Amino acid sequence: WKMNDGKIRFQVSSNIPEETPLMFTLRGKEYTAQCKSVAGNRISISEWFSDRGNPMKNGFYTIDVSCPIYSVLPEKIKKIFGERNRNICGQYVKFEPVGGNTIHFSYGLVLKNSKVQVIDMQQRISAL
């Protein structure tokens, strides 16, 4: 993540193939915003998130990063991922009965005075 003038942007390091479409979704109390991105060479970067052009309000947010279902992926990515994304596996791969495997992970964020504390939502509560 990176903060600038109260706005926030996210950067994800992964082995997701280049040109794979990704969706960044930021949610908070009375706040939801999304942006589309495309996986780069081991790094994917979101657009800047703001509160309608203003600095983000203090509070708890979640950032979700996900990959669309098989049917809407580019042909190049479909060949790599396989039918219904059967070739992908890992900690952040979830099976969906309708679309097959999808990539999805979440982190919690506490924003306070332009400072960010990140919480791994995959961790067990006892590990925090």
Give the ranges of each region predicted by the language model.
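Serine/threonine-biased, Pro/acidic-interspersed low-complexity stretches characteristic
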Residues: 1-30, 37-40, 45-128
